[in-house]
Amino acid sequence: MVRKVNIIKGNEGQGKRIKFVQLIFVDINGMPKGMEVPITRLEEAIEEGIAFDGSSVPGFQGIEDSDLVFKADPSTYVEVPWDNVARVYGYIYKDGKPYEADPRGVLRRTLERLEKLGIKVYIGPEPEFYLFKKNGSWELEIPDVGGYFDILTLDKAKDIKREIAEYMPYFGLTPEVLHHEVGKAQHEIDFRHDEALKTADNIVSFKYIVKAVAEMHGLYATFMPKPIYGMPGNGMHLHISLWKDGENIFKGEEGLSETALYFIGGLLKHAKALAAVTNPTVNSYKRLVPGYEAPVYISWGYKNRSALIRVPAFWGNGARIEYRCPDPSANSYLAFAAILMAGLDGIKHKIEPFAYVEENVYEMDEKRREEIGIDMLPENLGEALDELERDKVVKEALGGAYRNFVGYKRKEWEEYLDYLEAKNLPKDTKNVTEWELERYFFI
């Protein structure tokens, strides 16, 4: 079976002796969890599954009923180039059936629903991250003072980015663009779009690679949405297109198709509820403030980076939409499922997109925004969860994970409010607290 898996992934003959394989899934937060087993158990992991206790996995089962089974997906098998270990993603089962709260399973079921309509989904993410020096405290130290697109001496992390890019193909990712971002020590490596499930896997793999390479160089990498007050946050813009019979159905004769516009309409309608899933942490809303190119206003436009939804200047089979509010703290499987069902609702009910803008939304006064019908995203996680609980479409998109997700996030929000009260801090503070750093720095 190991040889068969190697042939599937094109890894046969690398001369490495793989002794262990990591069985990887994600918890309700999108954090990778799993276990290592001897490589001799890989066939068992694929055919029968490996049992584990789900009671200590955030957002999974209670201690009274916690027996779960991991079944490996052999198409995801890769060998870690810097270690004699392999990795494989998979699905969670309970009592012989797919576990309803398994985030990867939630996305698979969403995609199966779209496949019945003949639709395939392609998504290209743009996850941003910071690199920090290790100093044993939360006084974050930056290793470079580069700025946006700086490529010469100011960007001291260029060798690290190149090393990350060199490792990415081993995990099935194709790097396309490496560049310094706006913030000091902030970076972005874009990789090629792929089918939605593969892209969700790729995001988990990308974070793993970035953190591992940073560690090799004595640095920390963080995908935390807003690690430092006053500096740009980490976003994860998503480029989305739908395909049918080998054709991009977002492609119109002049710009976007009617289908694409209805998809945008669905996203705009459900944007407030979606925020709970695409921006699922307390810290996410420290990023979503005016002045840092992070979208705050629910609007759309062509080439307009101040809008929530931007239509890039690519036509034909390159036609797509860019959803700009997500950040890397999102569980990519749940976020993709929610976004796709919101967009599908727009297509199904022919929801016309509203709040079209050509000007900079941040420079508009309140009266002008009201004239156009521009609303705002939630201002904090608590508000976002309120919106989610009122939105039937997004709730149903999360399937069996919904109750666990909301319960976990409500508790998270309440713990944050308790911290603010104990520290005598205002509820609406935009400062990044030590509570957030301790909770989110390693996401």
Curated annotation (Swiss-Prot):
* UniProt KW keywords: ATP-binding, Cytoplasm, Ligase, Magnesium, Metal-binding, Nucleotide-binding
EC number per UniProt: 6.3.1.2
Its GO biological process terms? glutamine biosynthetic process
Q: Report the cofactors.
A: Mg(2+)
What the record notes about the co-factor is: Binds 2 Mg(2+) ions per subunit.
Query: Which InterPro entries does the record cross-reference, listed alphabetically?
Result: Gln_synt_N, Gln_synt_N_sf, Gln_synth/guanido_kin_cat_dom, Gln_synth_cat_dom, Gln_synth_gly_rich_site, Gln_synth_I, Gln_synth_N_conserv_site
Which residues does the annotation say bind Mg(2+) 2?
Answer: 128, 181, 188
The GS catalytic domain covers 103-443
Cellular component, GO, one term: cytoplasm
Write out the catalysed reaction: L-glutamate + NH4(+) + ATP = L-glutamine + ADP + phosphate + H(+)
Q: Does the keyword Magnesium apply?
A: yes
Gene Ontology terms, MF aspect? ATP binding; glutamine synthetase activity; metal ion binding
Per the record, a Pfam family?
Gln-synt_C
Question: Which residues participate in L-glutamate binding?
Answer: 233, 287, 293, 305, 324
Q: Which residues cross the membrane?
A: none
Q: What task does this protein carry out?
A: Probably involved in nitrogen metabolism via ammonium assimilation. Catalyzes the ATP-dependent biosynthesis of glutamine from glutamate and ammonia.
- Oligomer and partners: Oligomer of 12 subunits arranged in the form of two hexagons.
Q: What is this protein called?
A: Glutamine synthetase
The encoding gene is glnA
